[in-house]
Amino acid sequence: MKRSFLFWRWPLVASGVALIAATYGLVRLAFGLHLPDMSDDLGIDTGAAGLISAAGSISYAVAAVIGFLAAERHPRLLVIAATLTAGGGAVGIAVATDAATCAPAAAIASAGAGLASPALVRLVARTFAEHESSTPQAIVNAGTGPGLVAAGAIPLILTADWRMCWMIAAVATAVAGIAVLITDRARESAPVDTRANRPAILPPREWWAAHRSAVAASVLLGVGASAIWNYGRTVLVEAGASEAQSVTSWILLGCGGAAVIVTSRLLRGLQPRALWLIGASLISVSTLAIGAAPAQGTLSAAACAVFGWAYVTASGALIGWTTQINAAHAAAGTALLFVTFMVGQALGAAVLGALLPLVGPVTGFAAAAALGIAGGASLIAPARREATAPRV
């Protein structure tokens, strides 16, 4: 591999990791981390928390649809929009005075992640256009892990004030977004954008058919993953865990996600379906463990670490899956599958928010785990129609 190739391409991977870390780890997925403290100050009960989380997931989905339509032609504009929405929303959460003012800010903040993913998939794909891009794509997607580690470390090391944590997240998002724009040097050598070489906005019919089972699986696993993301720390605190213990579990969750950066090279020989099944199975086992035994500190900590690795692995499998179907529409496919993944999380957050006060974490988390297993098992035997669909 040429030295010049390493010199100017990999800085984009590093800045991409930072933007995913900020928009996902520090902003989109940090709501559950800060929820116990925010609930006390803003008067957010479990039902309201579920609705706010669902609104954030819907906002993410809408943003990802925009990314679906715009990523192929305007990835840099999406990076700017992702930075503004995630950063601005984080500031809005920091200054919120009650649940009514927190909800729209949380929704705006969640949009940043939905815009960032398809944009970065496109930027990485064109930067590594003449080389295998699965590893850099997996590394960028694993930025969620370091972001979660940082989200947990900030209240332990810098400040316990949840408002200041959100302000720090806003600043980090701005820095990461600017870094991506600076390190995206592939635009300098990109071909002239003519009608002949422009990708179509909407993929062909066969492309949609090839994604049917992936869409169904991602919705189911999204529901399964929603339990830990939205209520995991709350369940740990209610079971008697101290603030330090519950935050440490969140940091371990991030460490598990960050470990994907290392394991991506070791597992790159596996097909996306296999990675998806592994991720879905471990997400479900982790969810079941935390719901059944939240007071067991060692078990809960291990479950969080496993969940973090499994979640990032599963989401990375979605990128690999759609790229395998049609690399030219990888950004659009990522947006589509991340939308359906978050639709599942929105449904799960709302339903679990209503159910947990009635049935408790054991039953609620077990139901989520069962749906997660269903999401993984649905791909063991792919539908005949998809299996025979032409690779377009």
Name each region found by the language model.
Residues 105-142:
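Cytoplasmic helix-loop-helix junction between adjacent transmembrane helices
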Residues 99, 130-185:
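Helix-loop-helix hairpin linking two adjacent transmembrane segments in secondary transporters
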Residues 273-318:
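C-terminal transmembrane helical hairpin of 12-TM major facilitator-type secondary transporters
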Residues 24, 108-120, 306-318:
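Core transmembrane helices of Major Facilitator Superfamily
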Residues 62-97:
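Conserved MFS/SLC helix-loop-helix module at the cytosolic interface between two early adjacent transmembrane helices
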Residues 63-75, 259-272, 356-357:
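Helix-to-loop junctions at the C-terminal end of transmembrane segments
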Residues 325-361, 365-368:
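A late C-terminal transmembrane helix in Major Facilitator Superfamily
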Residues 43, 95-101, 293-295:
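Helix-breaking motifs and short loop linkers at transmembrane-helix boundaries and internal kinks
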